[in-house]
Amino acid sequence: EALRSRYLDNGMLDFLLKEREAGRIRNLGFSYHGDIEVFDYLLSRHDELKWNFVQIQLNYVDWRHAKEVNTRNTDAEYLYAELVKRNIPAVIMEPLLGGRLSRLNDHLMARLKQRRPQESVASWAFRFAGTFPDVLTVLSGMTYMEHLQDNLRTFSPLVPCTEEEF
């Protein structure tokens, strides 16, 4: 209902499509937040609308356990697979699950450090999100210079997660 009233019935989506056609919008997409019916509906119109990207929440918890975090969420594995089927690039939000994946308990941190002692805990989450081939970009909120430096080490160049690490 919100999609219909905010973007469809008032002509907003038609306006955005015309702006893209006129060259004032280069890439048109949407950010998905929760309602799977809306996600599926918008993707079902991809042949007509030609989405340039879709922003989804993807991290190693939400990959198969999204509903355990929030019952309204959909597993990122499903969301990503639907984008891949349609050749729509994914923009990734929440790779750290609101920072929670950068602050693990001692047992989990020790397991990660045992495998890759030089890497931060956050870098594991970024590497996971960046491993998938149809990911256009991974968004990262950075507050401090050390966050930026860690991100540069993680993504320059990105070392994808191995099968074992998955």
Please tell me what each predicted stretch does.
Residues 1-166:
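Beta/alpha (TIM)-barrel catalytic core signal, keyed to glycine-rich beta->alpha loops juxtaposed to Asp/Glu
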